[in-house]
Amino acid sequence: MRLLGLDVGSKTVGVAQSDPLGWTASSIEIIRINEAQGEFGLDRLGQIISEKKVSGIVIGLPKNMNNTEGPRVEASRNYGKMVSERFGLPIDYQDERLTSVEANRMLIEEADLSRAKRKKVIDSLAAQLILQNYLDKKGRLTNG
């Protein structure tokens, strides 16, 4: 059972995959989107789903530190609805608070990457952290 993890932003979607057993997550790529113009990268996402034989998707929810939901949470849920309707896959959500901060810290401290290089990979690494946190807590897709 391979899952995808998505870190959905207004300009990019970071994509990560689980191993077939659902133990570990690894980043795949960043899909460029343009939320304002209604370009959501679903064609590319569909290619990944098909190539990787994905059975479910986990989408990060960027909740506020006080656990309230802001406009980006709504945008992530809307993206999940679009993905579910288009591909017929179960969707679940994972709290993603601080995953981008953690990804940035990892890239600075452990990989010693420049700011320009970090910007190119941070979203897919955040997606990896979202999916890994989900796998560690739930193990398999629980929603859908």
Swiss-Prot record:
One BP term from GO: rRNA 5'-end processing
Cellular component terms (Gene Ontology): cytosol
Keywords: Cytoplasm, Hydrolase, Nuclease, Ribosome biogenesis
Top EC class, one word: hydrolase
Superkingdom classification of source: Bacteria
Family assignment from sequence similarity: Belongs to the YqgF nuclease family.
Function, as annotated: Could be a nuclease involved in processing of the 5'-end of pre-16S rRNA.
Matching NCBIfam families: RNAse_H_YqgF
Name the record gives this protein: Putative pre-16S rRNA nuclease
Upper taxonomic lineage: Bacteria, Bacillati, Bacillota, Bacilli, Lactobacillales
